């Protein structure tokens, strides 16, 4: 599962094909309250625009027992490599 942790206004730049948007603050709250525990069965990839928030999200989710990695360099790096995107 690919999680885009950017804010809604950042999505106008596009997003990775198939990614689900949950802004970082909301994602952390949901993880801490057990609202997304069903995702613990999945491998999760997080990203933001530059990688900073994606790393925070991955670290927090890993602390909560999720199997999470981040895309180094975020969406900017993803686009630079010519990968598939929506928008």
Model-derived regions: residue spans:
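Rhodanese-like catalytic fold shared by cysteine-dependent sulfurtransferases
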Residues: 1, 8-45, 49-87
């Amino acid at each position: 599962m690919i999680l885009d942790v950017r804010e809604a206004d950042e999505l106008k730049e596009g997003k990775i094909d198939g990614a689900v948007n949950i802004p970082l603050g909301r994602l952390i709250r949901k993880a801490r309250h057990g609202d997304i525990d069903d995702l613990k069965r999945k491998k999760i990839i997080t990203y933001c625009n530059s990688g900073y928030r994606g790393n925070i999200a991955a670290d927090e989710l890993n602390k909560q027992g999720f199997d999470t990695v981040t895309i180094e360099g975020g969406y900017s790096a993803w686009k630079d490599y010519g990968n598939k995107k929506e928008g």
